């Protein structure tokens, strides 16, 4: 069973390579002697850096090339940040494993200010995420929010060069890259509700590849799977892409799941929020019901306007 080399498709960014090596380590810890080969590749999202993500087109922006490698046999598994995984998969492919989640919160990063509330009016804050932008603008309408693209190192360099007074990044990414010291503070879910699946690593493979699926089975983290299942069910019901102003965060308290979600207008003028508590075994249904509640409260109109402005989504 271990004589076949498992090939991992991954993006070439430092964070993506960290995730691929992380999965490699888990696989080899569970299956000593297993041979693994990384297949680094460049995605469309890595190439187009001069356009806001929402306008490039959010569906599969960072995963399509990896999925093509699975379909044509160049790779056996693809490792993704769950927040980048589209709501639908190509025929024959699927998400089979979700690894244990790292801290899902957003990080406030600044060279001179300790807290978002400390920023003077007119300060420039960098983020390309519509989800982060709408929450920032609701809380601090006096700030200037500008797009910020590139890998983590590039973004930090732009901050250090004085292009921004602060930037918002994922806590998980900074921790994984050994850059935890750059975090001024981790923003609470009340302050900045995370993205669907943020902080979790997902593994995609061919659904008919039973050998690979058996190898991956021990890597699945059930608690993380339930939380991400609820978040993704909500997003699927909303027909949300990866680059839309949707936040969702599920927490497990014993056997009880607490799911929070929001849909916001990018300018911060409207914010629809909701939450659900229920049995963890009903995670998917809770996500669907919460999405229906948000839609009934006006989320449909907000998202329609976003898609009109960003038809590529």
From Swiss-Prot:
One BP annotation, GO: protoporphyrinogen IX biosynthetic process
Protein name (database record): Porphobilinogen deaminase
Family note: Belongs to the HMBS family.
Function: Tetrapolymerization of the monopyrrole PBG into the hydroxymethylbilane pre-uroporphyrinogen in several discrete steps.
Enzyme class: transferase
The record's free-text note on cofactor binding: Binds 1 dipyrromethane group covalently.
SUPFAM superfamilies: Periplasmic binding protein-like II, Porphobilinogen deaminase (hydroxymethylbilane synthase), C-terminal domain
């Amino acid at each position: 069973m271990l004589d076949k080399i498992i090939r991992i498709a991954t993006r070439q960014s430092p964070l993506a390579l960290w995730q691929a090596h992380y999965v490699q380590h888990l696989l080899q810890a569970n299956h000593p002697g297993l041979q693994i080969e990384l297949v680094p590749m460049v995605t469309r999202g890595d190439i187009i850096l001069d356009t806001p993500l929402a306008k490039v087109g959010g569906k599969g922006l960072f995963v399509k090339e990896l999925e093509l490698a699975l379909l044509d046999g160049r790779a056996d598994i693809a490792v993704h940040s769950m927040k980048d995984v589209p709501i639908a998969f190509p025929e024959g492919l699927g998400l089979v494993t979700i690894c244990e989640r790292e801290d899902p919160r957003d990080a406030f990063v600044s060279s001179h200010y300790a807290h978002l509330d400390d920023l003077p009016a007119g300060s420039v804050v960098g983020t390309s995420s519509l989800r982060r932008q709408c929450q920032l603008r609701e809380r601090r309408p006096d700030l200037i929010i500008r797009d910020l693209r590139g890998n983590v190192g590039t973004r930090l360099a732009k901050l250090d060069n004085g292009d921004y007074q602060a930037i918002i990044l994922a806590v998980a990414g900074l921790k994984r890259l050994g850059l935890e010291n750059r975090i001024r503070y981790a923003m609470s879910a009340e302050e900045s509700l995370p993205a669907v699946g943020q902080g979790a690593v997902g593994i995609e493979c061919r659904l008919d590849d039973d050998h690979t699926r058996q190898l991956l089975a021990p890597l699945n983290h059930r608690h993380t799977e339930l939380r991400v299942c609820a978040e993704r069910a909500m997003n699927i019901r909303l027909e949300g892409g990866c680059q839309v102003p949707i936040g969702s965060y599920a927490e497990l308290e014993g056997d009880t799941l607490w799911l929070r979600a929001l849909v916001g207008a990018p300018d911060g003028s409207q914010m629809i929020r909701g939450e659900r508590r229920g049995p963890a075994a009903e995670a998917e249904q809770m996500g669907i019901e919460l999405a229906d509640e948000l839609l009934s409260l006006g989320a449909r109109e907000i998202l329609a306007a976003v898609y009109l402005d960003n038809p590529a989504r």
